[in-house]
Regions:
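Extracytoplasmic copper-binding redox domains, predominantly the cupredoxin/blue-copper superfamily
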Residues: 2-172
């Protein structure tokens, strides 16, 4: 009996347990690498090649329409927000003009709230390679970019040309 116990104690760890541990470690490593790659890619602005570390300025804009005014963008920020100019009625500024500083990270959050017509809308700034997909009713998309040149640039909806405004980028 004592001999059997000694033999059992000297046996190497089962190879199936070792294989399972190695496979589990490999799966965890692959998942961690995938999450890391996704996180790295999500930090790259649409007009950049390297990740931008820091917090962007956030701008909220909704696409909508009315029977009287047609299609338009409305800011979701109050008029006192730095970087926002324009005039308009309702709950925000209609087709607002945004003012950014060159080199500062910006995020534009677009939502289609066109309840009246349920039309698709998009948001484009060609100068900075900012293009959303065609958004259906109540769909959203966020685009993060760095304004890397000064001047006045137009943003617009390619589906409804009357939906447009300006972005002014000032020097550093």
């Amino acid at each position: 009996m004592a001999r059997k116990r000694q033999q059992q104690q000297k046996r190497p760890i089962s190879s199936s347990i070792t294989k399972r541990r190695v496979m589990l470690f490999g799966i965890i490593a692959i998942i961690a690498a995938g999450i890391g790659a996704y996180g790295y890619k999500s930090m790259i602005p649409v007009n950049g090649k390297a990740p931008a570390f820091g917090f962007p300025a956030n701008h909220f804009i909704k696409a909508t329409s009315s029977a009287n005014s047609g299609y338009f963008y409305v800011s979701q920020s109050s008029g006192s927000v730095r970087g926002l100019r324009g005039s308009g009625g309702g709950g925000g500024i209609v087709n607002p003009t945004y003012t950014f500083q060159k080199g500062n990270l910006q995020s534009i959050h677009v939502i289609n709230e066109d309840y009246n017509t349920h039309s698709h809308h998009n948001f484009n700034i060609d100068a900075f390679n900012v293009h959303t997909k065609d958004l259906g009713y109540f769909e959203t998309q966020t685009m993060t970019f760095v304004p890397n040149k000064t001047g006045t640039f137009e943003y617009y909806c390619s589906i409804h040309p009357e939906m447009k405004g300006n972005i002014i980028v000032e020097g550093e």
